[in-house]
């Protein structure tokens, strides 16, 4: 599925834009602050319901406006789908699909699987475990129909359990929450373990192409001891959890650890090497989705040239072309992306929120 049309209104510094897009490569070229990243962010927001540079809705809506409006047309092999998202300063969203309201943001996310590569994306590698959980959960969401509901219920139950820990004095008082929490936790952990085991070979192969000088290993940590029932862990750690006033073990504490030559990648790799690794992981995940489901990702790449030499840019470009996916790339200069361009590509110039092709 590719995004053939994008309408943007009052998003960041873009007052209004109507873009006809290529199903292949789309380049956004302009100076820093011109609005090229805002176009990428509009696409991301249309598929996620939130921006990637700020969680504060007031910073995303154009100055002195009440709401932003995003519309898109998705072209699949058999049909076209119209999608829309409106969000106001109070954070209230309206999702429209094929002319009908009342839809959920998760439906947009399912329609538009996308991979985001930005200069801020290093958190996948040097940030906390929550970023690597999100990496796994993206794959589980697109691979398991029941994942999103289970994950949402897990978040709710952990929050309720943490609140209850401040009020109870005996474990028996907490058991009603745990009876609901335990099967959800075990199911989500199984899905994550199965997904990580299935994709690890693809990741290793892709990472070897981008970083042949390192041996990379991947390990999923589910958030509590191996070979131990989650029910036993919760009961055994009740007093400690009550003292901490939060649940210290569970899938909400899981991690996906990545090592280079046996050491954490954040301690071993340079910033340029970390960007290569991030690109390799996102690419491998998108390719895996295509291989197992036949669905293709959209790739959003901000500041393409930064910290990549010509050879690495060429490698990333060739791998992206091989996916036959739709790709959006921002760059300061057209020279940085000319080698990626072909007869099916589109080049957009961005200046002070105005976009021309």
UniProtKB/Swiss-Prot annotation:
GO terms for biological process: DNA replication; DNA synthesis involved in DNA repair; double-strand break repair; SOS response. Coiled coil: none annotated. It comes from the Bacteria. Keywords: ATP-binding, Cytoplasm, DNA damage, DNA repair, DNA replication, DNA-binding, Nucleotide-binding, SOS response. Its main location: cytoplasm. ATP binds at residues 30-37. Gene3D superfamilies: P-loop containing nucleotide triphosphate hydrolases, RecF/RecN/SMC, N-terminal domain. GO terms for molecular function: ATP binding; single-stranded DNA binding. It is found in: Cytoplasm. GO terms for cellular component: cytoplasm. InterPro entries: DNA-binding_RecF (IPR001238), DNA-binding_RecF_CS (IPR018078), P-loop_NTPase (IPR027417), RecF/RecN/SMC_N (IPR003395), RecF_2 (IPR042174). Belongs to the RecF family. The RecF protein is involved in DNA metabolism; it is required for DNA replication and normal SOS inducibility. RecF binds preferentially to single-stranded, linear DNA. It also seems to bind ATP. This is DNA replication and repair protein RecF. It comes from Klebsiella pneumoniae subsp. pneumoniae (strain ATCC 700721 / MGH 78578).
């Amino acid at each position: 599925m590719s995004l053939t049309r994008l309408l943007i209104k009052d998003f960041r510094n873009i007052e209004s834009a109507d873009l006809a897009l290529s199903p292949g490569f789309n380049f956004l070229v302009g100076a820093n602050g011109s609005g090229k990243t805002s176009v990428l962010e509009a696409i991301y927001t249309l598929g996620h319901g939130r921006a990637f540079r700020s969680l504060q809705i007031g910073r995303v809506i154009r100055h002195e406006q009440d709401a932003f409006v995003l519309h898109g047309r998705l072209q699949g092999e058999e049909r076209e789908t119209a999608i829309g998202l409106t969000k106001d300063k109070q954070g209230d969203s309206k999702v429209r699909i094929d002319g009908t309201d009342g839809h959920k943001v998760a439906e947009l996310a399912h329609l538009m699987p996308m991979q985001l590569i930005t200069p801020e994306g290093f958190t996948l590698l040097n940030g906390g475990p929550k970023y690597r959980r999100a990496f796994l959960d993206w794959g589980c969401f697109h691979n398991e129909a029941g994942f999103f509901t289970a994950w949402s219920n897990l978040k709710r139950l952990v929050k309720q359990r943490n609140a209850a820990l401040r009020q109870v004095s005996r474990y028996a008082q907490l058991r009603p929450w745990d009876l609901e929490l335990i099967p959800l936790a075990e199911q989500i952990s199984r899905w994550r373990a199965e997904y990580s085991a299935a994709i690890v070979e693809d990741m290793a192969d892709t990472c070897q192409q981008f970083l042949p000088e390192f041996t990379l290993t991947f390990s999923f940590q589910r958030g509590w001891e191996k070979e131990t029932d989650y029910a036993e862990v919760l009961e055994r750690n009740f007093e400690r959890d009550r003292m901490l006033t939060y649940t210290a073990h569970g899938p909400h504490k899981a991690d996906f650890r990545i090592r280079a030559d046996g050491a954490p990648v954040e301690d071993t790799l340079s910033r340029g090497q970390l960007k290569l690794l991030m690109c390799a992981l996102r690419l491998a995940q998108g390719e895996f989705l295509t291989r197992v489901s036949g669905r293709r990702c959209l790739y959003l790449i901000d500041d393409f040239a930064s910290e990549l030499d010509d050879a690495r840019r060429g490698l990333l470009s060739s791998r992206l072309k091989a996916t036959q996916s739709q790709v959006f790339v921002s760059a300061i200069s057209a020279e940085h992306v000319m080698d990626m361009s072909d007869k099916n590509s589109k080049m957009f110039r961005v200046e002070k929120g105005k976009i021309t092709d």
